[in-house]
């Protein structure tokens, strides 16, 4: 029979994964829009609960708050998990705990238990995880988003490109373990952006700052 010291790393990782998922499941965009008296954000624009769709309410402050809070879900989950695990399971397990908790926060954001597993696309939460677990990679990804967004004016394209490059950045700036986790998160983001990809290919995706044409 395995002793407690043998089981402890697995137990710690399990708790970190669950806590990360539950934190990620908190739908800050939905909560903020409702508190502002603007109804259900899922009935606006794309129906997404993230910052981009919150911006369609016309409230930049709510969109910014959503962006910060959604990013914070990944960052806080990763940092807290890593700090706690480092005291129990050792440094290597602490790194894995941070990656796992941050990754599960992204899963929670995309498939929140509180909303019937229908959530967002996880870009902000993923970037928060990158910044918390390997900040040089996170900064490189954020810089990539800014460059692509400035050049092409597509938020979705900027997100897809920056997350696709994150694993490559991690191989240079972090570790293969970081690269593997970031690759999985990038794949999840691409899957969640299927409709955006289709619109990009058709030239129908909305550009950043574009005004909708008034109905005749």
From Swiss-Prot:
It is found in: Cell inner membrane. It is an enzyme of class 2 (transferase). The keyword Lipid biosynthesis applies. Keywords: Cell inner membrane, Cell membrane, Lipid biosynthesis, Lipid metabolism, Membrane, Phospholipid biosynthesis, Phospholipid metabolism, Transferase, Transmembrane, Transmembrane helix. It catalyses: an acyl phosphate + sn-glycerol 3-phosphate = a 1-acyl-sn-glycero-3-phosphate + phosphate. Its EC number is 2.3.1.275. GO terms for molecular function: acyl-phosphate glycerol-3-phosphate acyltransferase activity. This is Glycerol-3-phosphate acyltransferase. It comes from Rhodospirillum rubrum (strain ATCC 11170 / ATH 1.1.1 / DSM 467 / LMG 4362 / NCIMB 8255 / S1).
């Amino acid at each position: 029979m395995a002793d407690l010291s043998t089981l402890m790393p697995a137990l710690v990782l399990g708790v970190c994964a669950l806590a990360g998922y539950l934190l990620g499941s908190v739908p800050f965009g939905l909560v903020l829009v409702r508190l502002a008296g603007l109804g259900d954000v899922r009935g606006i624009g794309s129906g997404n609960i993230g910052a981009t769709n919150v911006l369609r309410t016309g409230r930049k402050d709510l969109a910014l708050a959503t962006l910060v809070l959604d990013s914070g879900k990944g960052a806080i989950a990763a940092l807290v998990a890593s700090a706690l695990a480092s005291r129990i399971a050792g440094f290597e397990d602490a790194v894995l705990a941070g990656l796992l908790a941050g990754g599960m926060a992204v899963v929670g954001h995309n498939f929140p238990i509180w909303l019937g597993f229908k959530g967002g696309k996880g870009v902000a939460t993923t970037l928060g995880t990158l910044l918390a677990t390997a900040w040089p990679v996170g900064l490189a990804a954020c810089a990539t988003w800014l460059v692509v967004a400035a050049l092409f004016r597509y938020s979705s394209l900027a997100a897809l490109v920056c997350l696709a490059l994150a694993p490559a950045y991690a191989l240079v700036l972090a570790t293969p373990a970081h690269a593997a986790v970031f690759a999985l998160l990038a794949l999840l983001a691409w899957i969640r952006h299927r409709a955006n990809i289709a619109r990009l290919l058709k030239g129908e995706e909305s550009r950043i700052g574009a005004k909708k044409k008034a109905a005749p």
